[in-house]
């Protein structure tokens, strides 16, 4: 298996739910800016909303750093909308919620659990050239922290133009 770190983000085209509307998101939308792909197992679960709301509460900080967040699960964009409509906490999310019901994007980035039809908790920070600069993969019972992700993005952005260790 080829290492994914420093590789080019694969091509993709998926449906998404954002701010009350459906839209298509492709890898081309990520070019020219920093992006985070934030994979989680499923909508309507217990740990996932805590992570997604944590990201939503720090969304302005990420945006101030020139970063767009894209959450991704194997749920459809219709399920994302239903969860958004049903949950007061999920309504705080302003970033695109990407739908990968076939698991194609999850498989391309190595986070798909075949037996369960869902993703691991995977985080990918992508630079403006489309290269994956940070990879984090957790078992699904281990949540993530948006403050730590802010630190990692800051470090990745600082690395540009600097000598490597």
Stretches found by the model and what they are:
Residues 1-162:
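Chalcogenol-based redox active-site neighborhoods
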